[in-house]
Amino acid sequence: MSRTRRRRPRRAGVMTAVLCTAAVSAATLPAHAAPQGRILGAGAPGSVTGSYLVTLEEGTAARSAAGRDLAEGYGARISHTYGTVLNGYAVRADARQAGRLAADPRVASVVQDTRVALDHTQRNPPSWGLDRIDRRGLPLDRRYAWPEPAGAGVTVYVIDTGVRTTHRDFAGRARHGWDFVQDDRTAQDGNGHGTHVAGIVAGTSYGVAKKARIVSVRVLDDAGSGTTAQVIAGIDWVTRNARKPAVANLSLGGFRNAQLDAAVRTSIASGVTYTVAAGNEGGPAALYSPAGVKQAVTVGATDRQDKKPAFSNFGSTLDLFAPGVSITSASAASDTARAAHSGTSMASPHVAGAAALYLAEHRRATPAQVANALVKGAASGKVAGRGLGSPNRLLQVPRA
């Protein structure tokens, strides 16, 4: 009996401790704790932090005192009340306040606000390629529409024969990076290929991304020839000096070279998006470098009828196609000259420009995310005679 009596206080003590713990735990719960509802579009591209669109259920009018009190009761500040096209309002609130508002049964939905921008249109673009990449199907409509900010803030590195940076179509947005042919800081173009490519990327008249910056990295001589060592040196320079967000275009290639492919992969891993020409041999792109690099965006060519020309390489290595026959762009002959050329060299810079458009609105996107967005946004089922294993995807520029 004595043992039993001595145990009771201990049991009581244990019980008291448990009850005290429970009491403390209950005391730590905030008095204002409330369920959190779902915020639609939270964190989506272009979302506006702290701004939400609220739609109310039919039983509560947004313009009524009850409607106003509903939002304000959760700490949200109404910035605009709708009453005709939408029974709701725009509010300023933090994420917790918005979540509590979304959980209220009188609220139909809470959607995070997003930014909207103009689509700018160029009438009668000088290149049919521009006309094609903003339309999911033929016929062409003699217009090219692109989203602002038109590639502003994005740098595109043209690893090529150099660029005539003084050409008027660049409007002061092109500069020299490095010349690995003559080993100096003036990467001028004595061939014309690089200037033509740069014009497709970012020319004011001829370009896809009309406000992107161009940096010339010369790795090919005036005859359009160079060594793998020079190309790798150019890629190495871009990787070390890239001003991000950044895109690099390689409208060049040769037979498979493990070192060149590794250099491109390493540069992509550093955060630079690469667009590369599939090649003009009319064979499998997988046989050539850097077209065979899986992490790069490899581009085949199409003509005005959405057909793959005989010269364009093909195969599963390709990510998509873009215009590449009789493409008009800037010429290195003078500061106002233009020329028309064909090749996957012309197709790839269309995609580089589209990548710049995307990065201007998604500045933290990784190269893989950029590639995925371009592939997903491409028009499917349009390319005729695309070649064994090739994807049936044709470039479309991102829309605002």
PLM-predicted stretches and their roles:
Residues 35-45, 68-81, 86, 102-155, ...:
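Protease zymogen maturation seam
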Residues 123, 224-231, 252-322, 326-352, ...:
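Substrate-binding/specificity loop regions of serine endopeptidase catalytic domains
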Residues 2-119:
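Primarily auto-inhibitory N-terminal propeptides
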Residues 58-61, 85-86, 96-98, 114-118, ...:
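Solvent-exposed loop/turn segments at secondary-structure junctions
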Residues 143-176, 184-230, 242-247, 286, ...:
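Subtilisin-like serine protease catalytic core
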Residues 52-55, 90, 109, 155-159, ...:
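Structural recognition of the beta-strand scaffold that forms the well-ordered cores
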Residues 34-42, 46, 79, 212, ...:
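C-terminal subdomain of the subtilisin-like protease fold in secreted/lumenal serine endopeptidases
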